[in-house]
Amino acid sequence: MVLSKPTVSSKPIVFSGAQPSGELTIGNYMGALRQWVQMQDDYDCIYCIVDLHAITARQDPALLRKRTLDTLALYLACGIDPKKSTIFVQSHVPEHSQLSWALNCYTYFGELSRMTQFKDKSARYAENINAGLFDYPVLMAADILLYQTNQVPVGEDQKQHLELSRDIASRFNNLYGDIFKIPEPFIPKAGARVMSLQDPTKKMSKSDDNRNNVIELLEDPKSVVKKIKRAMTDSDEPALIRYDVEKKAGVSNLLDILSGVTGQSIPELEAQFTGQMYGHLKGAVADAVSGMLSELQERYRTYREDEALLQDVMREGAAKARARAQVTLAKVYEAIGFVAQP
């Protein structure tokens, strides 16, 4: 493999990624992917499909391969541009695993034991509590630190992992000098937090066992309409369409989704639906979401059917990523005391 020289940019470096372990949801799109697209002009963006993370839970090999390509096509369909951003598959850049092993030796067992996501996933995957699941945050730290990342878009469930990444980087720097940049969380100006349709007190998750809670990006729009029309609201009589997360979580979630799709503000939507029934709100949300997904899926099919294009994007993205990653890994190896490869 011939590696390109690393590109030098004056823009802040951003790293983020998604697992190919399940269908991405409108929550992933509105809360992450859409923001990634918007960041491309102002940031040096590195976007990864984190298949190494995916295997901390058992995967069907053929399905994992399919979902990796599905995810790549979705990235492109959402507007992530390989001419503006570096897009690659994690396992195509071996420096992620190499740096992860080195960082393991500067991470304490107690730190990993305190990670709340490990506790949650251990309960969910009780039959497969493997070392990779325990060690997941160190690989995430390697993902971030490998590219001298300035900012990381993170959700609530990953904030603790980013803090650990910062701690590992600071510990390493204190021992060996300024090897790593200390990454900061990226806090978007505005971003929809899409909640479960049937239980709007919890975040919509692609791993939810109850599929009625989830709207997938590749789901049949007719199925989406049915799910939204069954979504939880409340039993107020007469109906009151008002934004109040504490008292009206279901209604607030539908307003958030509609606002995220149409661009209308919450106060505008509250005014629009004054005196109307919950069915009117659900109908508007269903129409907006199904329309958005129909357009997205059309673009997705165009990319997904072009296997040669996907291969080119993966190949070029991995070459660009490796060119950067090797620079950082060489500095780390030299600092640790490894003999350079002749």
Curated annotation (Swiss-Prot):
One of its GO terms (biological process) is tryptophanyl-tRNA aminoacylation. It is an enzyme of class 6 (ligase). It comes from the Bacteria. The keyword Aminoacyl-tRNA synthetase applies. A motif ('KMSKS' region) lies at residues 203-207. A motif ('HIGH' region) lies at residues 20-28. L-tryptophan binds at D143. It catalyses: tRNA(Trp) + L-tryptophan + ATP = L-tryptophyl-tRNA(Trp) + AMP + diphosphate + H(+). Its EC number is 6.1.1.2. Its main location: cytoplasm. It is found in: Cytoplasm. Keywords: Aminoacyl-tRNA synthetase, ATP-binding, Cytoplasm, Ligase, Nucleotide-binding, Protein biosynthesis. One of its GO terms (molecular function) is ATP binding. ATP binds at Q19, P20, S21, G27, N28, G155, E156, D157, V194, K203, M204, S205, K206, S207. InterPro entries: aa-tRNA-synth_I_CS, aa-tRNA-synth_Ic, Rossmann-like_a/b/a_fold, Trp-tRNA-ligase, Trp-tRNA-ligase_bac-type, Trp-tRNA_synthetase. Homodimer. Belongs to the class-I aminoacyl-tRNA synthetase family. This is Tryptophan--tRNA ligase.
